[in-house]
């Protein structure tokens, strides 16, 4: 889940903290629980969580978002172990700066966005994230599980 919440840590209210963690972590938990019986019945499958780059880089005013997305990476690893006996792989794809409704091509560019372009010199396209998800869901990727895969144009190279 994409959560846009920028608040200095000292100003984050407990209700906002819990809301962000609920959107990200409860959302992944509930989706996985809903899908699990169907995946088990099918004899296996793939779960892909969508992480956040700030969980790996940090960012001002986003402690609650960073904590939630880092928790999602942990949940991915835990589920990979728990669900492996059911032939279910679980991975996390972490997009970089992507052309979305938040960064429409015709919208005026904010100076910090121009500075924050990745080494490839452009924002990614949603189709590039979809391609990674599609690849991870393919039959050639049954041995890949518990991984956090960054698709970010070189913005972070762990």
Task: Outline where the language-model segments fall.
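Active-site loop immediately N-terminal to the catalytic Tyr-X3-Lys motif
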Residues: 10, 57-63, 85-86, 121, ...
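Substrate-binding pocket helix/loop in short-chain dehydrogenase/reductase
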Residues: 8-9, 16-18, 103, 114
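Alpha-helical segment proximal to the catalytic Tyr-Lys
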Residues: 37, 81-85, 142
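Active-site helix of classical SDR
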Residues: 32, 68, 76
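Residue(s) in the substrate-gating loop at a strand-loop-helix junction
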Residues: 52
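Short, small/polar-rich loop/turn modules that mediate ligand/substrate recognition or access, typified
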Residues: 84, 89, 144-146, 152
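A conserved structural motif in NAD(P)-dependent oxidoreductases
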Residues: 118-129
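Catalytic Tyr-X3-Lys loop
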Residues: 3, 10-29, 48, 65, ...
């Amino acid at each position: 889940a994409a959560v846009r919440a920028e608040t200095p840590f000292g100003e984050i209210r407990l209700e906002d903290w819990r809301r962000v963690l609920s959107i990200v972590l409860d959302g992944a938990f509930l989706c996985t629980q809903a899908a699990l019986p169907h995946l088990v019945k099918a004899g296996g499958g793939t779960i892909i969580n969508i992480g956040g780059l700030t969980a790996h880089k940090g960012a001002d005013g986003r402690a609650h978002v960073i904590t939630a997305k880092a928790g999602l990476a942990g949940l991915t690893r835990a589920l990979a172990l728990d669900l492996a006996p059911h032939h279910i792989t679980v991975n996390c794809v972490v997009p970089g700066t992507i052309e979305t409704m938040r960064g429409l091509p015709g919208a005026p560019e904010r100076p910090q966005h121009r500075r924050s372009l990745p080494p490839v010199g452009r924002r990614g396209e949603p189709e590039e994230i979809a391609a990674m998800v599609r690849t991870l869901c393919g039959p050639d990727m049954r041995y890949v599980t518990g991984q956090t895969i960054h698709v970010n144009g070189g913005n972070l190279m762990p």
